[in-house]
């Protein structure tokens, strides 16, 4: 069986290679090079990533190829993020990177020549009813199915997640015992295309600055200023520069460039119990095809370890979730990710409208 393995230079993908080789496979290794447009935005950490990936390839006597998808990434993912921010929405570039780049452009250019593509994502695949479904990882804190919930059936049916059945500390221990060069490397943080670039610097480059008012939601009183609504997201608590907190963003007026904040006077105004999703993507199948009732599900609206219980309803306008608990920071542009009631199978996701 011919397997393509995606390397990032981190401990997770390195352990993927180690496990595949222990099982007798000889995967071909690929490092996908992405990044911002413009030399001043190129991330120097990519050089270290490639060095570590090269060391892994040499360690196991495997071929490593660097696949440059910088232009494809810029056209498909970075541009998407900028447009969402411009509209006052909260983008999720990691979701689109998986859908369009790692399992999109890479598959079209390279992966098509292999039987399977292995990655270091914390996820699993399940065989149910003769079909492949996206399953959650053993480690709920590291589970990354929410970042994979926009892929399609052709993509999930070719994916292999060798570390999905392991806890993070087990992965780290395997790397230490095997003496892998990335064994003690810290996990990457933040948006995938920014690398070490400051998020606000990225936004400022493309959207500039424009002073606007910060208004207390409950009283209508102006309590400060900001440099542009596009620097702020619903639910944001840090970086507001306001005294007397904690404050968090509860609303944005895009037309008048106003940020509304609150810190707990009226909890019912700050939270919601339901949200709608548009253009819902079922990864494998719609398990409720033809059903007109409510379905018991679990879901996520951001990358957190917790799965929230709720009810999924379908009407002429699409799908909506009624949560069993209050939800803070329901952000248009993010994705509502739907799972079965046991949080075992990830069915797909839709953009929160």
From Swiss-Prot:
A single Gene Ontology MF term assigned here is:
ATP binding
Site feature location: Interaction with tRNA: 121, 334
Q: Which InterPro entries match?
A: MnmA-like (IPR004506), MnmA-like_C (IPR046885), MnmA-like_central (IPR046884), MnmA-like_central_sf (IPR023382), Rossmann-like_a/b/a_fold (IPR014729), tRNA_2-thiouridylase_MnmA (IPR051305)
According to the record, the residues making up region (Interaction with tRNA) are 142-144
Primary subcellular site in the record, as a coarse category: cytoplasm
Q: Which CDD domains match?
A: MnmA_TRMU-like
Task: Specify the superkingdom.
Answer: Bacteria
Q: Name one GO cellular component term.
A: cytoplasm
Q: What GO terms describe the biological role, i.e. biological process, of this protein?
A: tRNA modification
Function (record text): Catalyzes the 2-thiolation of uridine at the wobble position (U34) of tRNA, leading to the formation of s(2)U34.
Q: Which family does it belong to?
A: Belongs to the MnmA/TRMU family.
* HAMAP family registered for this protein in UniProt: tRNA_thiouridyl_MnmA
Give the protein name, as stated in the record.
tRNA-specific 2-thiouridylase MnmA 2
Organism of origin: Bacteroides fragilis (strain ATCC 25285 / DSM 2151 / CCUG 4856 / JCM 11019 / LMG 10263 / NCTC 9343 / Onslow / VPI 2553 / EN-2)
**What lineage is on file?**
Bacteria, Pseudomonadati, Bacteroidota, Bacteroidia, Bacteroidales
